[in-house]
Amino acid sequence: MDSRKLSPRGKKLESHLSQEHRRPPLGLIAAWGQPSIQSSVQQGLQTQDWVCEPPERRRPGRRWSVSIDERRRLATLGGRERPGAAGTQLHCRDVVQMVAQLVSEDVDKDVLLPHPLRSTESTNAFQAFLARSAPFWHNATFEASRSPPS
């Protein structure tokens, strides 16, 4: 027989260990990154509020976690503000689309964009677009100067 089960002191130790080192149900193990196992067990299988980096991929000294609200915000943005190479390509594509829309609406080329997100990339994309559309600007300016105001 185990001596811990017989003595009152052992019962306290056993109950303390069982509370701290309790194994969560399989569903909770699969949903790693919960704020605490004990609170997750009490809440049952509810929506996970935080997503954390899996321990097997974590490098020493590096941790990240994203709240579910932040995940929703990023999802509604469609990836436009996500950092990295893909975000850079999306950003440049957005700038080109905004400039193309301004051109199609006969907006003057000197109009400033409302919120330049990355000045160097925005400037380069805008300048490249202007270089490609120089004949259009020349024709539009020439036609505007020829036609009388209505």
UniProtKB/Swiss-Prot annotation:
It comes from Homo sapiens (Human). The keyword rRNA processing does not apply. Coiled coil: none annotated. Residues 1-26 are annotated as: Disordered. The keyword Membrane does not apply. Its main location: cytoplasm. It is found in: Cytoplasm; Cytoplasmic vesicle, Secretory vesicle, Acrosome. The gene is TEX22. This is Testis-expressed protein 22. GO terms for cellular component: acrosomal vesicle. Residues 1-23 have a biased composition (Basic and acidic residues). Keywords: Cytoplasm, Cytoplasmic vesicle.
